Amino acid sequence: MNIVSSAKRQIILDTETTGMNQGVGAIYLGHRIIEIGCVEVINRRLTGRHYHEYINPQQLIDTEAIEVHGITNEFIADKPKFAEISKGFIEFIDGAEVVAHNANFDVSFMDHEFSLLQPSGP
């Protein structure tokens, strides 16, 4: 009998943002990601591999958001922009199942950031 074992690779993801839209429309409108943190898990065990970046959102962080995560405008002023880190992030998560506690929030913001990288149509 040939038993094939396939390792299940998961990436646990968390983000921090400049805030969130409290009004009408999508939660990400008017806001950007300022931190991405990920850890790799294979077969439910941490591997020690991780991905972490602070990101310059090119806009100010809401005071309420600073109170939540403690990341200040001054701290992220010299950090890379999302476009500069996006390739490394994609390479890290490639082929894995991505898991997030508040997935709707994190995925909405990630989708928004990647949509901003797309060239505008004619």
For each feature predicted by the language model, list its residue ranges.
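Conserved non-catalytic scaffold segment of RNase H-like nuclease domains
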Residues: 1-122
